[in-house]
A protein has these predicted regions:
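Double-stranded beta-helix
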Residues: 157-224
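Short, conserved beta-strand element in jelly-roll/cupin
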Residues: 139-156, 210-211, 218, 243-247
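Non-heme Fe(II)-dependent double-stranded beta-helix
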Residues: 1-30, 36-131, 137-139, 263-273, ...
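Short, charged/polar surface micro-motifs in flexible loops or helix N-caps
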Residues: 98, 123-125, 154-157, 169, ...
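Active-site region of the double-stranded beta-helix
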Residues: 108-109, 135, 151-161, 166-168
């Protein structure tokens, strides 16, 4: 790694679901903000139970991926749209304060829930999360789209997410890259692949965010991010990413394969994303 890492500043809530003004300004300036103590122990325990169900049920789901590297003692597991089949995730999305936090950080009056995405890196897995940005995968257009990423475990620097600060304001676009190194997306446009920002020359700044259970990160749909494998010997790195759509977002009928592949019901290019698959919550 050629780039030095800097630690993101973190912020406490003024009251439940209401971050301070400087936290919202950090999100708008840097493309990411770290918020401490966003969710109670009860919500984290509920999500942990839901993840156990998702992993045990994974062989029945075409949305679930289990990536293992020969010689590694652990695996990298991820799945999506759990809220549609596992009650613990549905309760979290619709009953916790997660939607309020997303709306407040984005300064959005309305809010649509896009989808949930769980990631589990077992101890000893070398599988990395490649550099990417979320918008490249999605049939959406607009700025008020965020990823609200919740830690279920203590996440030290060794396993923490990395972000290219301010990259959400860069104009250049890149193709999506599959998290499974043996898989590829179909019909991608003729644009460059995402560089490896750990070694890419330039004056960009890479920040990391150590976390405790119940902390969250909120980042923009164009913020470049990645994560290392889990080199810890005894601790998993479990996280839930929830994705939220605000006031200025419309459906973008992209020609290439998107991830998740679901396009909702009756959506029209340039129109609202609201439908049964992507429900309005505010």
């Amino acid at each position: 790694m050629n780039q030095d890492l800097v630690q993101l500043s973190s912020y406490e809530f003024e009251s439940i679901s209401i971050p301070p003004a400087d936290a919202i300004e950090a999100y708008e300036r840097d493309g990411v903000v770290s918020l401490r103590g966003a969710f109670s122990e009860e919500w984290i325990e509920l999500l942990a139970h839901g993840m156990e169900i998702a992993i045990s049920d994974s062989l029945k789901q075409d949305t679930a991926f289990n990536i293992s590297t020969p010689g590694d003692p652990g695996f990298f597991f991820y799945d999506t749209f759990m809220w549609q089949r596992i009650n613990q995730f549905k309760r979290f999305v619709f009953e916790s304060n997660v939607a309020d936090i997303a709306a407040n950080v984005m300064r959005s009056k309305g809010l649509i829930f896009y989808f949930d995405f769980m990631l589990v890196k077992e101890p000893g897995t070398s599988s990395k999360t490649p550099w990417h940005y979320d918008e490249a995968y999605w049939p959406i257009k607009g700025n008020q789209i965020c990823n609200l990423w919740i830690a279920l475990d203590h996440i030290p620097i060794e396993t923490a997410l990395r972000f290219v600060i301010g990259s959400h304001r860069w104009a250049k676009s890149y193709n999506p890259v599959h998290f499974d190194p043996d898989m590829y997306y179909a019909d991608l446009p003729n644009i460059p692949p995402m560089p490896d920002w750990d070694v890419e020359p330039g004056d960009h700044k890479i920040a990391f965010a150590p976390m405790d259970p119940g902390d969250c990160l909120v980042f923009n749909r164009r913020t470049f991010h990645s994560a290392p494998g889990n080199s810890l010997k005894t601790s998993s790195r479990r996280a839930l990413a929830t994705h939220w759509i605000g006031d200025d977002v419309t459906y973008n009928d992209k020609a290439h394969e998107t991830d998740p592949p679901y396009r909702g019901e009756g959506l029209v290019h340039g129109g609202s994303m609201e439908c049964a698959t992507f429900p309005r919550v505010r």
